[in-house]
Amino acid sequence: MNLLVLSVILAIIIYLIFKRNYKYSPSKINSKIPGPIGLPIFGNILSLDNKNGIHTTFQKWFKIYGPIYSVNMGNKSAVVLTGFPIIKKAFIDNSEAFAPHYTFESRYKLNKCSDITQENGKNQSALKRIFLSELTVTRIKKQESHIQNEIVKLMKVLDKHSEDGKPFLLNNYFSMFSINIISRFLFGIDFPYQDFEETSDLMVGIRDLLIASGEIVLSDFLPIPHSKRSKLYTSYQALVVQIETLVKSHKYKEDDECMLSKLMIEHDKGNIPWDAVISNCNTIITAGSDSTSSTALFFLIEMMNNPTIQTKVYNDIVVSFEQNQQADDYMNESMVILKYSKYRSLIPYLSLALKENYRKHPAAPFGAPHETTQETVIEGYTIAKGTMIFQNIYATQRSDTFYSQPDEFIPERWNGDENSQTLISFGTGIRDCIGKSLAYNEIFTIIASVLNRYEFINPNPSIPFDDNGIPGLTTQCKNTVVQIKKR
């Protein structure tokens, strides 16, 4: 038995060495690109920091090896690109070669990679057509009424906390806000704020899946079996159970405007399989709710850690509202909602602060990995066909190579032409975040409206809030206990 095990291990080692040194292999072609030296078989996998986030390791290596470097992920060859000029050359100037998302075996076993973020095959064009038809400027503007109504419900809850003056946990309320917006878009339903029991499992499920999705799954890169007890598998299946319940309870009508009905119509036409309906609902509810709530929470943390900036943002909002207010800004006698479609260009300092927040706190630190479809030369380096490609978003936006004082929150850096770099907080290229327009709308409207109504206060001002977050596929905001004062 021991001899058999030893023989298998030896065979695997020989296979991996042959594969890595085969002259046409991605690893061999990419070997001329600088990068960290890895271990036999494992490559650089064991050097990746799962605890603090893989993006922190990518940032460290960028400082050593520069804007283009190679990483050996077990038996897979990867290249990490940093800085907008380099990323643009790959994902915009050579868009077709860098367009597909990388197919992880672990993800394929979960849902056959059938959702919009992973699908590269025949269903991708059908899914993209569905999503783009629901995310036009006109359709998003129609969503504004739902966003306004949701903010009113949130404000009624926040008013009570303002009245009692006690510190409270802010995270769940913003998670509920985001889940309700995306649930209205997806299912045509929302949930009450009074009781978190109905959505607490959903909130936890979304958080657990995003954290697990940001960790390395060894079986994706080494010839070992995939485990159904892995955090990724168990968190995905737990969330799917909840999503399937919501899907089955949906009253399907062909004239429905919710996204689920559109997916069901395409399924009935034979354009997408049922697995794709479920997996896309899962992706929409997960990515759609998290990107908004986490980004908004990080913004409010920056406001409390920088109260002078919060005051400047508030004053800018007040001046703009006094000059531009109309009857339709009032949802009732006292509640004002500052809509994105009307106010996005009328509150300049808020726009600078939001841009700075997108820079400092990108929704996904390295996005979804891509795969090259052909051999391509970028900045003199030949990148092999079949190479896994990372957009190093976090290091791009938190490096002093591109921004002075990158760890500081400085809205003024976006004044004039001092920083002409293009933000890539939601990725870039033809496969960037498809829902970013809706996210921009939600985040602007909720931030402008709540800052106009409340001052957000750190109950322990001598201890600034931790703005690093919990690492994962997206960065989760840590539990944030605040006080608010009605203005």
Swiss-Prot record:
Residues reported to bind heme: C433
Superkingdom assignment: Eukaryota
Topology of the protein relative to the lipid bilayer: Single-pass membrane protein
Cofactors, names only: heme
Keywords: Heme, Iron, Membrane, Metal-binding, Monooxygenase, Oxidoreductase, Transmembrane, Transmembrane helix
Any single GO CC term annotated in Swiss-Prot or TrEMBL for this entry: membrane
Transmembrane intervals: 1-18
Gene3D superfamilies (UniProt xref): Cytochrome P450
Pfam families, per the entry: p450 (PF00067)
Cellular compartment(s): Membrane
Annotated coiled-coil segments of the chain: none
Molecular function terms from GO: heme binding; iron ion binding; monooxygenase activity; oxidoreductase activity, acting on paired donors, with incorporation or reduction of molecular oxygen
Classification via InterPro entries: Cyt_P450 (IPR001128), Cyt_P450_CS (IPR017972), Cyt_P450_E_grp-I (IPR002401), Cyt_P450_sf (IPR036396)
EC annotation from Swiss-Prot or TrEMBL: 1.14.-.-
CDD domains, A to Z: CYP1_2-like
Family per record: Belongs to the cytochrome P450 family.
UniProt protein name: Probable cytochrome P450 513B1
Species this protein is from: Dictyostelium discoideum
Gene symbol of the encoding locus: cyp513B1
